C-alpha cells in the first residue's frame, strides 16, 4: 500500500496551475485542413502567454507533445519556443505518451518545479490528423538510400529498374498497434464483448456526452478557456469545437453500422471519438512564484500516476489501474472527489473502466487490492461532456481535461477533481487536481 506523496517543492510550495487554454477542436480535414500541429501549438502557446500577461522570460521550460510526429519538426516544443517570441534560452523538449501525452508533459514540468531547476513552465500538446506523414514502401525507401550512395547514373537506373508500380504507392500512417496489429477499435470491441457493455449503453453515453458539451457551450462555460483560431486563408475564424452534435436524438445513434466488427460489433463512429485536430497548453509555477507575480492559480496538482497493462486483452483499462494509485498518492478516496473526468476514447472503453472501478473482484484478483476503487457518481462524471463530443487531438486532450476540470471546480466553490485517460500501448494516466 503506497503512502500519500505530496507534490511540493523543497521549500514546501505546491505546484500551481495558473492558466490554461486550447484551440477549438476540429474534425479531421475541416477547419484546420493543411495546418500542421506545430502551427496549432504556436497558436495556443502564443495566445496563452498574451492572455496571461506573463512576461515570456518568466517561462523557463516548455514541454510539449505530438503523437503523429512530422519528420521535418521532430522537436515540436523547441519550434514553439522559437515561433512565439519566447526567450531563445528557454529549455524545450518534446514527449510522447500516446493519448496521455499532455499528462506526461504536465508531470515533467511538475518534476522540474519540485526539483528546483525551474520556477515556471508550460506543458501541453498538439496534433493534426489532417496533416500526416505519408510514407513510402520499405522497398522504395531502401532503393532511395542505395541510390544516394550510387556513384553513376547507370547504377542508379539499375536500382530503380527493380521497383514495381506497387512499390511507388504512398503508405499512410499505421492505425494499428505496432506490437499486435490490433486497431484501437478492435480492443474497444473486445472490451464490450468481454465485459457485457451493450450497444444501447454505448449510444446512451455518447448522446449524453454531446448533450452536455453542447450545453456547456450554450451556457458560456468554455468561452474563456477556448481561443478563437484564425487559419489560412483567414476567411472564417473558428471559435467553437465543430464535432459537437447539438440537435441529435438517441434514435440517431442506433442507425449507424458497426465500424470494426461489421457482423457482431457494437462500436460505431458515433459512440467513438473522431479523428481531430487541435492544441492545448497550461502554465505551471511554484505557489510562491505565482504569488510574486500576483497571479491567482486555477488550482494545484495534488498527485499523478502512470500505469501499463497488457496490449492483447483490455488494452484500454488504463484509468481503472491508474486511478487508485493517483488517489492513494493524494491521500483521498473516490468519495472525496467533486468531479471525475475520464477520456472517452470509446463509449465501450469508458463504461468498462467505470464498471471495473466499482468491482471488488477486479480489485482483488487483478489489482491486488482489498476493495474496489469505488463507484462513480454520474452527477460528478464528465459533467461538461467528454472526448466523444469534443474530439481527441491525441496530445492535446489531457491539457483540455485539466483546464476544463479546474475551471468547473472553481465554479462549484472548489474541491478535488480526477482526470484520467487510457492510451495506446496499454498505458494509463490519472491526475488529482485541487481548486480553492
Swiss-Prot record:
Catalyzes the final step of fatty acid oxidation in which acetyl-CoA is released and the CoA ester of a fatty acid two carbons shorter is formed. This is 3-ketoacyl-CoA thiolase. Belongs to the thiolase-like superfamily. Thiolase family. InterPro entries: Ac-CoA_C-AcTrfase_FadI, Thiolase, Thiolase-like, Thiolase_acyl_enz_int_AS, Thiolase_AS, Thiolase_C, Thiolase_CS, Thiolase_N. Keywords: Acyltransferase, Cytoplasm, Fatty acid metabolism, Lipid degradation, Lipid metabolism, Transferase. Its main location: cytoplasm. It is found in: Cytoplasm. Heterotetramer of two alpha chains (FadJ) and two beta chains (FadI). One of its GO terms (biological process) is fatty acid beta-oxidation. The gene is fadI. The keyword Transferase applies. The lineage of its organism: Bacteria, Pseudomonadati, Pseudomonadota, Gammaproteobacteria, Enterobacterales. Its EC number is 2.3.1.16. GO terms for cellular component: cytosol. Pathway: Lipid metabolism; fatty acid beta-oxidation.
Amino acid at each position: 500500500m503506497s503512502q500519500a506523496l505530496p507534490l511540493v517543492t523543497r521549500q514546501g510550495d505546491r505546484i500551481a496551475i495558473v492558466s490554461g487554454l486550447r484551440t477549438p477542436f476540429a474534425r479531421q480535414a475541416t477547419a484546420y485542413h493543411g495546418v500542421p500541429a506545430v502551427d496549432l501549438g504556436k497558436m495556443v502557446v502564443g495566445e496563452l502567454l498574451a492572455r496571461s500577461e506573463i512576461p515570456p522570460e518568466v517561462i523557463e521550460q516548455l514541454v510539449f507533445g505530438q503523437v503523429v510526429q512530422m519528420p521535418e519538426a521532430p522537436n515540436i516544443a523547441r519550434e514553439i519556443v522559437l515561433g512565439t517570441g519566447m526567450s531563445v534560452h528557454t529549455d524545450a523538449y518534446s514527449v510522447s505518451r500516446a493519448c496521455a501525452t499532455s499528462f506526461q508533459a504536465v508531470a515533467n514540468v511538475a518534476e522540474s518545479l519540485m526539483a528546483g531547476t525551474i520556477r515556471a513552465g508550460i506543458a501541453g500538446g498538439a496534433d493534426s490528423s489532417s496533416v500526416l506523414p505519408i510514407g513510402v514502401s520499405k522497398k522504395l525507401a531502401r532503393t532511395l538510400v542505395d541510390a544516394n550512395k550510387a556513384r553513376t547514373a547507370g547504377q542508379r537506373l539499375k536500382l530503380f529498374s527493380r521497383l514495381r508500380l506497387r512499390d511507388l504507392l504512398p503508405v499512410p500512417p499505421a492505425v494499428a498497434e505496432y506490437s499486435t496489429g490490433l486497431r484501437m477499435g478492435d480492443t474497444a470491441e473486445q472490451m464490450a464483448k468481454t465485459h457485457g457493455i451493450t450497444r444501447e449503453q454505448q449510444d446512451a453515453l455518447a448522446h449524453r456526452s454531446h448533450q452536455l458539451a453542447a450545453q456547456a457551450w450554450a451556457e458560456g462555460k468554455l468561452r474563456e478557456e477556448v481561443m478563437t483560431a484564425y487559419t489560412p486563408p483567414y476567411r472564417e475564424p473558428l471559435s467553437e469545437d465543430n464535432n459537437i452534435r447539438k440537435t441529435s436524438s438517441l434514435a440517431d445513434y442506433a442507425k449507424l453500422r458497426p465500424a470494426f466488427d461489421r457482423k457482431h460489433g457494437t462500436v460505431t463512429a458515433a459512440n467513438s471519438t473522431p479523428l481531430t485536430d487541435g492544441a492545448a497548453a497550461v502554465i505551471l509555477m511554484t505557489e510562491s512564484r505565482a504569488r510574486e507575480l500576483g497571479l491567482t492559480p486555477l488550482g494545484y496538482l495534488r498527485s499523478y500516476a502512470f500505469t501499463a497493462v497488457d496490449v492483447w486483452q483490455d488494452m484500454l483499462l488504463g484509468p481503472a489501474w491508474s486511478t487508485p494509485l493517483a488517489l492513494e498518492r493524494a491521500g483521498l478516496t473516490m468519495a472525496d472527489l467533486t468531479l471525475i473526468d475520464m477520456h472517452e476514447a470509446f463509449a465501450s472503453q469508458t463504461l468498462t473502466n467505470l464498471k471495473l472501478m466499482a468491482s471488488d473482484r477486479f480489485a482483488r484478483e487483478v489489482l491486488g487490492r482489498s476493495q474496489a476503487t469505488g463507484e462513480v457518481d454520474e452527477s460528478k462524471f464528465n459533467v461538461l461532456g467528454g472526448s466523444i463530443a469534443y474530439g481527441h487531438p491525441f496530445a492535446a486532450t489531457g491539457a483540455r481535461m485539466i483546464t476544463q476540470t479546474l475551471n468547473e471546480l472553481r465554479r462549484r466553490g472548489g474541491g478535488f477533481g480526477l482526470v484520467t485517460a487510457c492510451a495506446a500501448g496499454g498505458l494509463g494516466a490519472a491526475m488529482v487536481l485541487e481548486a480553492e
